[in-house]
Regions:
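Long, low-complexity, Lys/Arg-enriched
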Residues: 1-85, 98-272, 277-282, 288-302, ...
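Conserved catalytic cores of phosphodiester-cleaving nucleases, focusing on short active-site segments
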Residues: 275, 307-309, 315-324, 333
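Glycine-rich anion-binding loop/nest that anchors nucleotide
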Residues: 5-9, 89, 319-321
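Trp/Phe/Arg-rich N-terminal binding region typifying the photolyase-homology
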Residues: 86-93
């Protein structure tokens, strides 16, 4: 097979999986008009394949979404020009699939499909090379964005340094659980006493009043027990507290400074480490920012995924919430999963609050798993992630 015919699908992975597996010299996409004319989208696909280490010839042919007879005529013309062609019927519209069936019946061209449930390719007609063939491909988080026309941008976290801090994340989260109800005030206090000048490297040494101005005119005093615990687990150093007067300490480094000044960082870092601890993911990224297309400036659309992981050809999208689970957060997560993961992608929302029945029901409707406070407190997150990715059976 030197030529592979792909029935273009709105789910990005359906357009690249068979080409990447069999690596033909030429890929012909029968696609909607907007794709056939979208040079930027086509360049993204070329960039994806280059990133994967090969440069096939890509041909984009506009095809009808609903007229099977027109699609059949196109297929027959392609078959005449490229008699070595094979047909992937994994994606595409109903009309395209109907035409593909007639094409293979008339010409004997090989046809095959991919089963996401089995993660195998199967011979449909005359494609013995694809029969019961296990898909051993593995994609990175960036690959999933690129194949869907997106771009991975730098996020709030330098993922290159996280491996140095892995042993800190569990104690950090245990500290959070102990002081969960006061956590917002604790972080707010640290923010107040550790200001920084714009454009300057923030100082690690902190000195401030014991009581500072809080939100809405309230007063916020140092939580001595929490600060002492942060010192015990070595996130801050040289802690000195003069009750009712002053507090001073030193952040361990700039990274811990950033995490201790952000309410949600503790959960995101804990979720990141949980993904690592499962041992099943080939790539994990904290704070994955994706730009939807090549538009920059005004009109550019980007979103942040708190934690994203990849296991083979299946991505996992994690949303971390240090608050109640809201419908808006569930809807946004579902949109990102569907846009950049497609069918088979997994999504879960992790909350430091108990999940109410309404939110759990909405999550189930959207196919989103829920990991809430009770499972976090009982240390079930690693097990739950394995179950979500079907790497382990659920326990009851």
């Amino acid at each position: 097979m030197e030529t592979l015919i792909e029935l273009y699908d709105e789910r990005a992975i359906e357009n690249i999986l068979a080409p990447d597996m069999f690596r033909p010299q030429r890929i012909i996409y029968l696609c909607p008009g907007e794709i056939a004319q979208d040079r930027k989208r086509q360049e993204k696909l070329k960039a994806f394949f280059r990133r994967r280490g090969w440069t096939p010839e890509l041909i984009f042919m506009e095809a009808s979404l609903f007229k099977a007879d027109r699609i059949l005529r196109q297929l027959l013309a392609i078959g005449e020009k490229y008699p070595d062609c094979a047909l992937d019927v994994t994606g595409g519209s109903d009309a395209a699939l109907f035409a593909a069936g007639m094409f293979t019946a008339q010409t004997g061209a090989p046809a095959f499909t991919y089963s996401r449930k089995k993660n195998r390719f199967y011979d449909i007609s005359g494609a013995g090379f694809a029969d019961d063939l296990y898909c051993d491909l593995s994609y990175s988080v960036e690959d999933f964005f690129l194949m869907a026309g997106g771009t991975l941008l730098p996020g709030r976290v330098d993922n290159g340094i996280l491996s140095k801090y892995l042993e800190d994340f569990d104690p950090f989260f245990s500290c959070f659980l102990r002081f969960r109800r006061d956590w917002t005030d604790i972080i707010s206090y640290i923010q107040r006493i550790s200001p920084a000048e714009y454009g300057q490297i923030p100082p690690l040494l902190v000195q401030g009043n014991y009581t500072v101005k809080g939100d809405h005119g309230a007063r916020n005093s140092a939580n001595e027990a929490a600060l002492q615990e942060l010192a015990r687990i070595c996130l801050i150093q040289d802690l000195t507290i003069v009750r009712d007067e002053s507090v001073s300490f030193r952040f361990r480094d700039q990274n811990t400074r950033a995490w201790l000044r952000d309410v949600g960082s503790v959960l995101e870092l804990y979720a990141y480490k949980a993904c690592i601890d499962t041992g099943i993911f080939n790539d994990v990224i904290s704070s994955a920012v994706v730009r939807w297309d090549d538009t920059v400036g005004h009109g550019s659309v980007s979103n942040e995924i708190d934690v994203m992981a990849a296991r083979g050809v299946i991505p996992l999208f994690l949303s971390c919430k240090a608050c109640d689970i809201r419908t808006e957060a569930l809807n946004e997560l579902a949109i990102l999963r569907d846009r950049f993961g497609g069918k088979g992608a997994k999504a879960a929302i992790i909350s430091t609050e108990p999940c109410n029945a309404a939110a759990r029901h909405r999550a189930a409707q959207l196919g989103i798993a829920v990991i809430d406070l009770e499972e976090l407190k009982s240390g079930q997150i690693v097990h739950r992630l394995k179950v979500i990715m079907k790497a382990q059976k659920a326990s009851f």
